[in-house]
């Protein structure tokens, strides 16, 4: 599978806002997400990160403006066609009680044949490939509930890979994991993007993890985009203070010199 051309975009937003009665959660914003890259949505709690991600995944319709996928309004896509392009993983994962890893990953094939379609050889090949890519093929017959936190998250990501979508939307994929499993999952996401040309848009809380594993960052505060760009452009004390509202500084990492943030 060839990576997408780097000048393409997956999602673009034109003066998009989102409101609930009595409150505007996202103020009008315009931006485009680069295709084939890992993009991190960062910012304080309540800044609008998850709301924006849910709008991209068509879980929230925009109050105003237009969200486009590949230059086409998201409302114009059928459910099946949209699912063949975009896969969404919520922060609160659905129950997988009694399901094996293979059974969970196979759910990703649903957009390609539907509830009454036959699960064929091509579907099995996609499932096997997805499990192999995330390192879970030896666990195919294990119950999902018996896996560690990192393994369970990899199983859900394998389901998205089996869906064969070009864009993955991940809402805080590392929030319930310890540091070792956070690194494991983010390294996997980065590798999948680079090897398969996938666009990944993920809500992330840890700015240092986001800077290490993302190609592009979009920072929100109070429902507004206040900074965006490569991690090197965001990892400055004054920019981080503007994003998080507290004094922050930057030190070079002793191995490689990559910028690492800290709180005063």
Language model regions located:
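The feature captures the beta-strand-to-loop junction immediately N-terminal to the Walker
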Residues: 42-44
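Conserved ABC transporter NBD signature motif
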Residues: 65-73, 82
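Catalytic Walker B motif of ABC-type/P-loop ATPase nucleotide-binding domains
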Residues: 168-172
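Helix-to-loop junction immediately C-terminal to a conserved catalytic motif
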Residues: 57
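Conserved ABC ATPase signature
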Residues: 118, 143-147, 151
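Conserved ABC ATPase "signature" region
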Residues: 106, 121-139
């Amino acid at each position: 599978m060839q990576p997408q051309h780097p000048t393409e975009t997956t999602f673009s937003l034109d003066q998009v806002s989102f409101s609930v009665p009595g409150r505007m959660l996202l103020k009008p914003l315009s931006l485009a997400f680069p295709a084939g890259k890992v993009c991190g949505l960062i910012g304080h709690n309540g800044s609008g990160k998850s709301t924006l991600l849910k709008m991209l995944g068509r879980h929230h319709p925009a109050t105003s403006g237009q969200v486009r996928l590949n230059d086409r309004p998201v409302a114009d896509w059928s459910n099946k066609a949209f699912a063949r392009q975009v896969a969404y993983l919520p922060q609160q994962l659905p129950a997988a009680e009694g399901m094996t890893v293979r059974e969970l990953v196979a759910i990703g094939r649903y957009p390609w044949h539907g509830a009454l379609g036959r699960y064929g050889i091509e579907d099995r090949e996609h499932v096997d490939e997805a499990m192999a890519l995330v390192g879970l093929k030896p666990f195919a017959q294990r119950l999902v509930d018996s896996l560690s936190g990192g393994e369970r998250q990899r199983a859900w990501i394998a389901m998205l890979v089996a869906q064969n979508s070009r864009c993955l939307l991940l809402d805080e994929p590392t929030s319930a994991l310890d540091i070792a499993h956070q690194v494991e999952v983010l390294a996997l996401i980065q590798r999948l993007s680079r090897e398969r040309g996938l666009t990944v848009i993920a809500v992330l809380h840890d700015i240092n993890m986001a800077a290490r594993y993302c190609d592009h960052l979009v920072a929100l505060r109070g429902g507004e985009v206040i900074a965006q760009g490569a991690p090197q452009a965001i990892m400055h004390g004054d920019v981080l203070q503007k994003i998080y509202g507290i004094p922050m500084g930057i030190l070079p990492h002793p191995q490689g010199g990559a910028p690492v943030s800290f709180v005063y």
